[in-house]
Every structure is written in C-alpha cells, then in structure tokens.
Amino acid sequence: MALTTYTELKASIADFLNRDDLTAVIPDFITLAEAQINRDIRHWKMEARSSGQQSASDEYMQIPADWLETIRLHLTGTGTSVVNLISRDAMADKRERNEDTSGTPMYYTHADGQFQLYPTPAADTDFELLYIQKLDALSGSNADNWLLLDSPDVYLYGALIHSAPYLAEDERVAIWAQMYGASVARLNEASETAKFSGSGLRLKVRGLV
C-alpha cells in the first residue's frame, strides 16, 4: 500500500491495528503522533525564516504561529547584529538596573508567548528570525507534508504507539515504539549529516502571524 497521503496513512494504521472499533480515533492517533514528532525531530526541512520590522518603543515581538524553537534572531537594518537569548531573571535585572532604557536590541527572552527585547527599540528595527517550525498537520484538507513523503514510517509507528491505551497488553506496542525511535534517530542523523556535507539547503520564508 502506498503511504503518501493522509487517507492512505489512516488506512495503513487501520490495517496494522486490525480493529474496526478504532477507526474513529485514528485521526487522534495521528494528531498525538504529530505532537510527539514536533518534540523529537529536529530536521533541516523544519527550518524557516521570518522577517519583519519591530516598531519603536515596543519591547515585545510577536512569534510566528508555527514557531517551535529559535535558531537565531538578528537585526538586519544596517549590517547584521545577533540578538542573544538570556533568562527572564537576567532580563528583569537589566531592566531594573538600567530603568528600561531604549536603544538597539541586544538581548531577548521568552515572555507570555512573545520575545521581550532589551533595550526597547529606540526606532523601527528590521529583523530576521531563523527558527524550527512545527509540522504542517495532516488533515482532510492537507493531504501530505514533507515528513509523510520522506519518512512515512515515522508517522505510521508514531501513530500506532498512541493506540496503546486501547490495546491492553499487546506486545506489538513495544515493537512499534522501537521502530519509531529508530526511524526518528535515523532521520535526525541524516539531517545532521546533510548540514555538514555541503548540501544546498533551502529555507521556507514565512511572515509573522
């Protein structure tokens, strides 16, 4: 059976489970697998860029809706200046000691689902964010994504292990978990190899949402 679309993935999971009573919850298994995959996989195909302009006097920067993890944040107006991540305590300390001064942002921290910048931008500031993005979730209106096309085994075994609560002491669950772990490890390793092999990597460019 081909495994290149959401419909084909659901059919394959149903075949592996061989349980007619679980058909309705298979989409939930896939959703749970995607949540776990977003935690487990760091692949160059998940890298994306988002560029924009931060308004003067606004210390809080919006994060893209599909953001998982920051690789690098830098300013792009005149040359390139990296904005470094610091802890919330360090941010609070800087603002307390320097009375929330304004200037060119040099640091950021995570605050309430946003990036808090320091110093607060004194002028409109252009930036570019390089980050790890979430998978495009599969659904009836989104038949595939790069992971399903490249590594359908990750999706298949990831979904199957989330059927465990319905299968009691089924020995297959442990096998599926091993297969999932091995597939994830190979995918992450292949990504690291590609990064250092001179392969041409192309990033997706997203606007802030």
Please provide the spans of the model-predicted regions.
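Glycine-enriched, solvent-exposed interface loops adjoining structured elements
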Residues: 1-209
